[in-house]
């Protein structure tokens, strides 16, 4: 059981998001989660759709250094390409026709906490470049803005495809891949966790 050795009294909401499983592959994923949680390292969860990558990301946040900070989740595949930059980095008033007021992006909303970027392989190359800058410099710039904004955010990403293949195909930046792949964690599918099926 992944949650058996976690001090629940120190984890807000941790009991509601316990990760339970006995299969060796699942136990290994939980072990890697506990090992990286106290650090500020960027984590990349890899696994098929439906294996619980967001649940792992939330548990990582709950047992990490800033559990009381915000946890902001973004499904990158669900955001139209034309809006992804303004959603992630915010927008200044007048940046485009419908921008009638300035608005924070997900990075600013996650300041002091965790930003979970699901289906990260779907980001445009332009958005990937801005994300790389945010990871390297700890700052962002809103769409239509000229001022840099410092953000203190732990970025956690997830993908259901092998990003190495995306890099080879020219669809994903190699430098961003290396920034995200600091601590990869593969989440096994249920068919690979036969010991857990009776649970």
Report residues per predicted region.
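Conserved Sensor-2/SRH helix of P-loop NTPases
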Residues: 197-198
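AAA+ ATPase active-site-proximal loops
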Residues: 7-150, 155-161, 166, 190
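Basic, polyanion-binding surface patches
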Residues: 170
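Short, well-ordered beta-strand elements within core beta-sheets of diverse protein domains
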Residues: 184-192
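Conserved small/polar residues in nucleotide/adenosyl-binding loops
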Residues: 1-6
